[in-house]
Curated annotation (Swiss-Prot):
Organismal lineage: Bacteria, Pseudomonadati, Pseudomonadota, Alphaproteobacteria, Hyphomicrobiales
Function summary: Part of the ABC transporter complex ThiBPQ involved in thiamine import. Probably responsible for the translocation of the substrate across the membrane.
Entry GO terms, CC: plasma membrane
The name this protein goes by in its record: Thiamine transport system permease protein ThiP
Species this protein is from: Brucella melitensis biotype 1 (strain ATCC 23456 / CCUG 17765 / NCTC 10094 / 16M)
Membrane topology of this protein: Multi-pass membrane protein
Quaternary structure annotation from Swiss-Prot or TrEMBL: The complex is composed of two ATP-binding proteins (ThiQ), two transmembrane proteins (ThiP) and a solute-binding protein (ThiB).
């Protein structure tokens, strides 16, 4: 009697794929739910008045959190609009592709590295201060406080907004530009009739996305806040546990942060998401006609200013790092120990993230029920509701009732970083998996190829490059993480970001600059590997 082949088999049998996806969702639910449960139990049975912690300090911190996020979002998008418009108009601008690649780097850089780059340009001993001294107008800019936070957030988010706007520009039909050229429209008329309608549709989702990134910004505010007046909710959570060890205060702050995050995600869902094509946008747009000389000059100036704003802090990291005593730094055992620890934790987190993401993607493809498939599809993204510092705070409070939380530090760092990388890994893996499944499912079913044989012979060649991309991206995110390690780090567990923060705290600025260069090179190398894998995958697809 001939066995009937399974209709869908790829990573494993059809019955086990939804089970594997369910286990991946259970991992995320346990991580987030355990933190929430710990916070709820602490609030309900901790022997303190929960309402008393919702005092003027908490509301002041919450107001500053919202204020700095609103200001950062509006300024980032405001500066991004003319830069994106200029880059789109100057389709043949020399180095346009290089600028777009440069604009992808701030998100790849660990926040701590970028902060050091910003201080090397705008700090009291930075480039601007040196230039003003040379011109005979000495100044000592104060980078710490709201000014430094805004400068750093614009550095991170303005390039992101530019790339998202360029993706929106790609949706404009060629006929619109052709008609504008035939009618002899000026720059203002083109902006009012063609550019602005597209920009206006993208603004709500784009501002919401940048606002979300700024609200959950931890490292930037921790290093550039400069005092109690410039403290956000996440930094206050860290301070209440790490310095004051006040779980009651941490619980109140965490619930406030969680409520704010949920509200932002709800607004994002109602306003819509910005297009994601801008993350890989490198195509040259088609334009009819050419800008006038004055408009072209303006475009070149705008592009140059945007380029300098992003390039100078990155160059500052390189220059400052090279001026450090790298030979002495690399001769220290603690530095190599931190590098090895970071690589080991990053490798483990990336491997776990890719494995769990594959389980979710396979379960979604194998499930016929649309609702269940949607749960598998969106399950990974829901973890973003809880910032890493919130998850870390919950588990820190829970673990202290059973064991020393610092003993569990490696496990917590790996699991939290893996969970935070999963939404991005799923987004990278899903298209390749679905394409391979649509091509091979029927043939494999007819030939009876299933289980490990299908994974080895059919699926793996199709998903190898996307897996490499997801692994490199997840490892880069984990290498630069400071949120979880800031709570669980100790002398027994030192990563590169944690060691860098320690050297900054002890005012060993040259050592910090050298460590920042090492960390930045590691993360950028991983992102370049992921980017090259993406390019190779695209070339193979076109062939």
């Amino acid at each position: 009697m001939t066995a009937t082949p399974a209709r869908r088999t790829s990573l494993a049998s059809p019955a086990t794929k939804p089970v594997a996806g369910g286990l991946a969702l259970a991992f995320l639910a346990t991580l987030a739910g355990g933190a929430l449960l710990a916070l709820a139990l602490e609030a309900g049975g901790g022997g303190f008045d929960a309402a008393a912690n919702f005092d003027t300090y908490l509301w002041r911190v919450a107001r500053f959190t919202i204020w700095q996020a609103v200001a950062s979002s509006l300024l980032s998008v405001l500066f991004a609009i003319p830069i994106a418009r200029a880059l789109y108009a100057e389709a043949r601008f020399p180095g346009r592709g290089l600028i777009l690649r440069l604009f992808a780097q701030p998100l790849a850089l660990p926040a701590l590295v970028a902060v050091l780059g910003v201080t090397s340009i705008y700090g009291r001993n930075g480039l601007i201060a040196h230039i003003s001294d040379m011109l005979g107008h000495p100044m000592q800019p104060d980078i710490y406080g709201i000014a430094g936070i805004l400068i750093a957030h614009i550095f991170f988010n303005m390039p992101l907004a530019v790339r998202l706007l360029l993706a929106a520009y790609e949706s404009i039909p060629d006929d619109h530009w052709k008609l504008a050229a035939q009618l002899g429209m000026g720059s203002r008329a083109r902006f009012r009739l063609i550019d602005w309608p597209v920009i206006r549709r993208s603004l709500p989702g784009m501002i919401g996305l940048v606002f979300m990134l700024c609200v959950t910004s931890f490292t930037t505010v921790l290093t550039l806040g400069g005092g109690p007046r410039a403290t956000t909710l996440e930094v206050a959570i860290y301070q209440s546990l790490h310095f004051d060890f006040d779980p009651a205060r941490a619980v109140a702050l965490t619930f406030t942060q969680l409520a704010l995050t949920l509200l932002i995600l709800l607004i994002l869902r109602l306003t819509g998401r910005p297009s994601e094509e801008g993350f890989t946008q490198t195509a040259t747009p088609r334009r009819y006609g050419s800008p006038r000389k004055t408009e072209r000059l303006f475009n070149i100036i705008v592009i140059a200013l945007g380029f300098l704003y992003v390039a100078l802090p990155i160059a500052g990291v390189v220059v400052s790092g090279l001026t450090a005593d790298l030979v002495r730094l690399l001769s220290e055992r603690i530095v190599w120990h931190a590098i090895a620890t970071s690589l080991a934790l990053g490798f483990s987190a990336a491997l776990l993230a890719v494995f769990l993401s594959l389980a979710l993607v396979a379960a979604r493809e194998a499930t016929r029920n649309a609702r269940i498939a949607n749960i598998f599809d969106t399950g990974a993204s829901l973890i973003l509701v809880m910032p890493p510092i919130v998850i870390g705070a919950g588990w820190f409070i829970l673990l202290r009732h059973f064991t020393d939380p610092f003993v569990m530090a490696p496990l917590m760092v790996v699991t939290v970083n893996a969970a935070m990388a999963m939404p991005f890994a799923v987004r990278l893996l899903r298209p390749a998996w679905d394409t391979a499944a649509s091509r091979h499912n029927k043939l494999c079913s007819q030939l009876g190829i299933k289980g490990f044989n299908r994974l080895r012979l059919i699926d793996w060649p199709s998903i190898r490059r996307p897996c490499g991309m997801a692994f490199a991206f997840a490892m880069a995110l984990s290498l630069g993480d400071l949120g979880t390690i800031a709570l669980f780090g100790s002398d027994a567990l030192v990563t590169l970001p944690y060691l860098l923060l320690q050297r900054m705290g002890s005012y060993r600025t040259f050592d910090a600059a050298g460590l920042a260069l090492i960390l930045g090179v590691l993360c950028l190398a991983l992102m370049m590997i992921a980017d090259r894998a993406a390019a190779s995958r695209k070339e193979a697809f076109l062939q």
